[in-house]
Amino acid sequence: GKVRLGFHQVTRPEGNNTLEDYASNARGMNVIVPTWFNVVSSDGTYTSLASKDYVDKAHDMGLKVWAMVENVSTEESVKNLNTKTLMSSTSTRKKLIEKLMNEADTYGFDGFNLDFESLKAEAGPHYVQFIREMSVACRNKGLVLSVDNYVPSSYTAFYNRKEQGIVADY
């Protein structure tokens, strides 16, 4: 069926308690993307607002949960994270992906949504490689992988949407 997705901005743990209010105003929505994982440093460290109760409640409401992994929602991530450094290291990518797959096991959500913004061109190929590797890990676990992108333009061509379209589900 069609994906009718809504983003749920969760900025602190209490934000998870607003799922029912939020979803009640979004008739027809069948996927919710809570903003749970903020990558805050170039070694792949991230903060988590994930909640098993949220996932269980969403599932009871007939919603799939695709947890967002992003790099821009906090001052800490904007200040400390060099995405090229993070993404250009094979071992760091592998460690980050393994940790994220463990989160999926722990919380029981249905997929991931990647939202990496403000990348510099030199980070582009490494980010695409991360998406490839994340795609394999997600497929092995039966998880969906979706990627958020800018409107296509010449100055964001390095996001390589064509390759993303091959390896990501959405």
Language-model features: locations:
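Short, conserved loop/helix-junction motifs that constitute active-site signature segments
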Residues: 25-26, 167
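Chitinase-like catalytic core of GlcNAc-active glycosidases
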Residues: 2-13, 38-170
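Non-catalytic propeptide/linker segments at domain boundaries
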Residues: 1-6, 16-25
